[in-house]
Amino acid sequence: MDGHNVVSRSSRHRKKRRMGRIFMLLVMLIIVGVGVYAGVKMLLSGDSLASASTIREDFVVTEVAAMGSAAKDKTAPTLYNGMKRKVVYLTFDDGPNAHTSELLDIMKNNDIKGTFFMLGENAKNNPDMVKRMYEEGHYPGLHSMTHDYSKLYKSGGSKNFIEEFQEAQSIVNDITGYKPTLIRAPYGSAPQIGEEFRGDIANAGFKMWDWTIDSYDWKYPGNPSAILSQVQSQLTEDTEVVLMHDREQTAQILQQVIDYIRSQGYEFEAYHPDQHFICNFRHDERL
């Protein structure tokens, strides 16, 4: 066999091997391409998108739930079926007295509950009214014994204040069998109640509410429509605490106040200890 034929056969053999490798490479590229196409198609399919959406929704729900638990004692709006609930807490100070029954009648006719911050002496003198209030689902809050500014605030400490509220608490407990812990300071909590004073109130086991809307009803005997105007001008937030009093003019305008608040999309609630939120002028989270 001459050298030329050997070289020729060797060259042809190398070409065949090279072509074989190229063919195998092309086959592998085709297989990879088919796999990528199938994967992309699957990712773009409805089932995969639904799964991705579900994962995201689960994450969002968990995130919102975590935020909700952290803000439970704050003034965050309550949610119902994914919508913000607008809630008004009607509160009445200084009773019970001759006008309290009128207020209770109106609220009963409207199927709404409120919160009554009572003076201990008035509660002692009107036990049947206190019983009715409690039995009809209203919260029996406390408003001191005397409402005396000098006695409550000018003694140099919290002692007189706390003793008056403890006495009022005992009176309501004796009448209803329930020991209320929510109080409202006469004349409001600021500026007369400082940080240490507030700490003493919290240590005595009380929570304290001021208000977000002042109806100034005490200023308008004979002019109840002015009370409605005050409420209308101040009703802006999703949660409002309205300050009123057990007065004749308040009873005269209460139905119109209720009608207006409802027309703005609000519901009514009484205070519930297990749904407490901060509503004091200093935003003290202890109270």
Residue locations for each model-derived region?
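N-terminal pre-catalytic segment of deacetylase/amide-hydrolase enzymes
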Residues: 2-90, 96-109, 225-226, 260, ...
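A near-ubiquitous, low-amplitude feature marking generic local secondary-structure context
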Residues: 23, 75, 86, 90, ...
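Active-site beta->alpha N-cap acidic-glycine motif
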Residues: 59-174, 178-179, 260, 267, ...
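Catalytic domains of cell-wall/extracellular-matrix polysaccharide-remodeling enzymes
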Residues: 124-125, 145-269, 274, 281-287
